Amino acid sequence: MTLTDDPKTLVSTAWLAAHRSDPDLRVIDASWYLPDMGRNAKAEYQAAHIPGARFFDIDEITDSRSNLPHMAPPPEKFVSRMRAMGIGDGHQVVIYDGAGLFSAARVWWTFRLMGKTDVAVLDGGFPKWRAEGREIEDMPPILRDRHMTVSRQNHLVKDVTQVAHAAKLGEAEIIDARGAARFKGEVPEPRPGLRSGHIPGSKNVPYATLLNADGTAGPGTCNNWTSSGDGSFRWLTGSPRRKPRRTGSAPS
């Protein structure tokens, strides 16, 4: 492998441009948009993407046994889809999205849930890459199957019962990363059928407040999310839902 400097959670567009031809580097387009955004992630990928990028279908690579959307896929499904995308053991994976820094973080988390640590997010995503005039293409990559081994990290997931218990007893900090208006229930949820408001006791840290104007992560963003200092857990939560018929991994 020719990666000389070790990428961590975030890599810059300059880093990716310098390492894009490394044989063990794989790039993923993880674009996904809320219904009210009026964008089609797959169509945009087919029209233009970073050379060699594979498209990660967030709507399809999920737990199809659940009645809730975007639940984390079972390990065997994740492995099957990654092998079909030519991604496997020994690959350094860099993930980006078309909004700058939005859905790529979810796919990064999915890799980490499966025990894969050689994975990073492109800081600023596709908008920054294009703004800098870097190379793009509209051709699909050549895919070759590669073996992948995973080990699901169950400690990274809390189900609805655990979160409700923590909220009731105040045993953990529960962070809601949606915008303030959605947190306060002042606007309807973009997904139909969801109640407005937030989990009792949760705190609102809108993800957009952690970003710079160009969509890159603000100073100290990673440290803010990984360091609690008081021994408490910090959980990232999504929308409050109607009572589910099944508990499992946390939805987006």
Region roles according to the model:
Residues 1-252:
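Cytosolic catalytic domains that perform sulfur/thiol-centered chemistry
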